[in-house]
Amino acid sequence: MGLGLLLPLLLLWTRGTQGSELDPKGQHVCVASSPSAELQCCAGWRQKDQECTIPICEGPDACQKDEVCVKPGLCRCKPGFFGAHCSSRCPGQYWGPDCRESCPCHPHGQCEPATGACQCQADRWGARCEFPCACGPHGRCDPATGVCHCEPGWWSSTCRRPCQCNTAAARCEQATGACVCKPGWWGRRCSFRCNCHGSPCEQDSGRCACRPGWWGPECQQQCECVRGRCSAASGECTCPPGFRGARCELPCPAGSHGVQCAHSCGRCKHNEPCSPDTGSCESCEPGWNGTQCQQPCLPGTFGESCEQQCPHCRHGEACEPDTGHCQRCDPGWLGPRCEDPCPTGTFGEDCGSTCPTCVQGSCDTVTGDCVCSAGYWGPSCNASCPAGFHGNNCSVPCECPEGLCHPVSGSCQPGSGSRDTALIAGSLVPLLLLFLGLACCACCCWAPRSDLKDRPARDGATVSRMKLQVWGTLTSLGSTLPCRSLSSHKLPWVTVSHHDPEVPFNHSFIEPPSAGWATDDSFSSDPESGEADEVPAYCVPPQEGMVPVAQAGSSEASLAAGAFPPPEDASTPFAIPRTSSLARAKRPSVSFAEGTKFAPQSRRSSGELSSPLRKPKRLSRGAQSGPEGREAEESTGPEEAEAPESFPAAASPGDSATGHRRPPLGGRTVAEHVEAIEGSVQESSGPVTTIYMLAGKPRGSEGPVRSVFRHFGSFQKGQAEAKVKRAIPKPPRQALNRKKGSPGLASGSVGQSPNSAPKAGLPGATGPMAVRPEEAVRGLGAGTESSRRAQEPVSGCGSPEQDPQKQAEEERQEEPEYENVVPISRPPEP
């Protein structure tokens, strides 16, 4: 029962093992048709290793005793046999199953039946037994190499020479034929026995070679050594290392080792004994190394087993190998091993120097420099870390996003960057606003003005537009620039023109020097001033807030305030060089002759005029042409004869001042003022001075704040639109040409209203000559004096005996033509 169950289990185990070991690519390996698709041997084959190479011949195809199965169901004879029953051996020339393979060894050998290898005869050698042997009858050759192996008693390469030795006690060498004696025999042919009591003897001499433990000539005495061996000749004991004595029975004493204990031990630790035979120590003393502790430590090391490094000795010198002490130390160190830093307050070699004062730190023991504590730096460690650094000597940069950290710990300080940003922004915003304000002011000051005075003149009047632009610059500088002398520069012509009838007077242009100006001409109109004063000068117009006439302390203060009245005050009298053609223009215009000075020269009264004896420079300008030249030409107008009245004596110099606005003159006309001034000039003993007052009413008064904003252009447009346009009354032509024989006004002209009486008296005058010239021109300051220094043209400054009719003709020839001036026809004089 048990056996029946065991066999199926064994078969299942065998199949599983075989199936798992088969190679899918092996010979005769097939896949089972079962659903498991396991590997198995094909039909008729049996598994061998991982393949199925054993054929199966079973049943009726089973092979007989001397047959083998070569394929499933096919049997053949064993190799080397043939026949019906496979009982006959193959002939010598065949081999293999059924003797079907031919043997190449025939006829000098036979083939092995299964493999076909040749087996040569005794006298043949080679792979196919093709070589004959040369060993003779007493030798046998090797079938593979052909070397002869001689029989005993024969030697030579062919085994053909007999040996000469005792064959019972020796053998001879096959190559040389020499006899090799067996133990106990000696001699050339080994014919003598040895007498050594069982010990061998030398073959040539027969001397005994005693065995260990025996000594003597014939090895008859036994040695007495406890350890070691005795001498074969004397019997003395040769002790091994670590022992001594006659019989080597004593070990070496402590501290010695070697043969006969002749060597001393090394530096073993605590003087422990070393090994008596080898001399090695279990451990060495400090400073020594090696198995026998006889090697000192290498330079730079010390201690047990030389495992420690020497300290910083002076200049890297080696320390003591056992203690590690240094002979000298580097600066900053003390102690036997130079491991102790200098005491506090000292540094340097042998700590002999005193440290400097370190407020927040310690002194470096080597260099003496201060090593600052965390958060401080500097030569004396008295300065806190700068922003962005922390640590000792402030050498560690902060790693905070905002760049600031605690100077000691390095921790980031939140908000520090924000505070700095706010501080920077608070500083930059006012600066930016100030910059923008300055830029706006510059744009407003330098931008073209939209006032009525900026209205362009007739087409092609480029010079007039340029004059208007220069007027803006002079107006802006008027409140800050005092009267200046232009040193070595000469201004031959200064023309102040206005081209708008609604604005009484404006300074607009300073013409450049003429190309025809003579370098030796003088700018001075006063012969008493001398050549030193002949320098051109100008004065800027006064602004609001100037000192009035009543508060002026002296003529210098009055003159320094300015020479021109402000352009908005047209009623203020001011001195103008004589240009009679201005009276004929549609718009009031003023032209200054060459060499006119605008700065005061001396403290003269308003009545003083330049000397008429000085030769005018207009004669050298005869070739001048153009609009500027025509404006500068001076002619004697007929209105010169319209001033027979004389004014009272001149006022004191302190009465004239600049920067003072006088109120309007009421119902008086400009012609009345001119006649009064001319009459006063004719009666005066000095040179003739012509003073003009332009027609028109002054602008409304304005405060200082409004005046500043008007200069910046804020109120100019609005103010121009709010005011009612008023025209300056144009003087009639007949009034200008009434009297031609009177002394002409060479530098200016006076416009009159058609309804004004030419000889009407001024208010407050006691007669036609009651008003003095100083009172008519009060408030002009330097402008009055500059008019006194203006050079008089020939027609106005010539000899008083000159023919008036001739002067009138010259005036008509030299009279310039002005734009928009239409001559008015008048009836002939009675």
From Swiss-Prot:
Region (Disordered): 516-539, 581-688, 715-830
SMART domains from the UniProt entry: EGF (SM00181)
Composition bias type Low complexity, residue spans: 644-653
GO biological process, one term: heterophilic cell-cell adhesion via plasma membrane cell adhesion molecules
Disulphide bond pairs: C57-C69, C63-C75, C77-C86, C99-C111, C105-C118, C120-C129, C159-C172, C165-C179, C181-C190, C219-C230, C225-C237, C239-C248, C306-C319, C313-C326, C329-C338, C355-C363, C358-C370, C372-C381
Domain EGF-like stretches: 53-87, 95-130, 155-191, 215-249, 302-339, 351-382
Acidic residues composition bias: residue spans: 634-643
Topological domains annotated Extracellular: 20-421
Residues where Phosphoserine is found: S589, S606
Single GO MF descriptor: low-density lipoprotein particle binding
Annotated signal peptide: 1-19
Topological domains, Cytoplasmic: 443-830
Localisation per UniProt entry: Membrane
InterPro entries: EGF-like_dom, Growth_fac_rcpt_cys_sf, LE_dom, MEGF10/SREC1/2-like
SUPFAM superfamilies listed in its UniProt record: Growth factor receptor domain
Subunit description: Heterophilic interaction with SREC2 via its extracellular domain. The heterophilic interaction is suppressed by the presence of ligand such as Ac-LDL. Interacts with AVIL.
Protein name: Scavenger receptor class F member 1
Gene: SCARF1
